[in-house]
């Protein structure tokens, strides 16, 4: 009896830990491609409710069209091969904006080594991407200025 209580208590603690981070935890069943879980953090970030994330198609269709084909194909091929992976893409918000996401994926395999499920975390990397874009812009400005300088 005590072991069951401890297990329930541990489970509640782990759930609280997962749901109190800024990262968005998720799990997809590989055979059905349905979400077994997605953290409540998804709604404040993207505007879509937890309940609206039913399957992998919901994930793919809420991705920027320019990122979709590569991202989906990359994730499928890595997952089929049983390889953990990371990918950056732009996710559609409910109000038709975009947020840069880094998806970190761990492939869970059964005793035969076959892919059973995918678990991972989504991270909002929008600020990092804005900083990268600004650095690229500044670098181009510096290059342009260096060609205008009569000393070079």
What role is predicted for each listed range?
Residues 140-152:
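Conserved nucleotide-binding and Mg2+-coordinating catalytic segments in signaling enzymes
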Residues 1-13, 66, 123-140:
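PAS-associated C-terminal cap
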Residues 48-111, 115-118:
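PAS-family sensory domains
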Residues 30-31, 94, 111, 126:
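Short, ordered coil/turn segments that flank beta-strands lining enzyme active or ligand-binding pockets
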Residues 9-59:
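PAS-family sensory domain signal
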């Amino acid at each position: 009896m005590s072991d069951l209580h401890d297990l329930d208590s541990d489970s509640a603690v782990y759930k609280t830990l997962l749901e109190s981070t800024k990262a968005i935890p998720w799990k997809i069943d590989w055979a059905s491609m349905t979400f077994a879980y997605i953290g409540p953090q998804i709604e404040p970030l993207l505007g879509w409710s937890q309940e609206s994330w039913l399957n992998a198609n919901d994930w793919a269709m809420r991705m920027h069209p320019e990122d979709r084909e590569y991202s989906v194909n990359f994730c499928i091929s890595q997952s089929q091969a049983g390889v953990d992976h990371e990918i950056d893409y732009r996710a559609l918000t409910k109000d038709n904006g975009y947020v840069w996401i880094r998806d970190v994926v761990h492939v869970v395999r059964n005793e035969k080594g076959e892919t059973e499920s995918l678990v991972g975390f989504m991270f909002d990397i929008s600020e990092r991407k804005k900083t990268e874009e600004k650095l690229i812009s500044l670098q181009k400005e510096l290059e342009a200025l260096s060609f205008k300088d009569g000393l070079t």
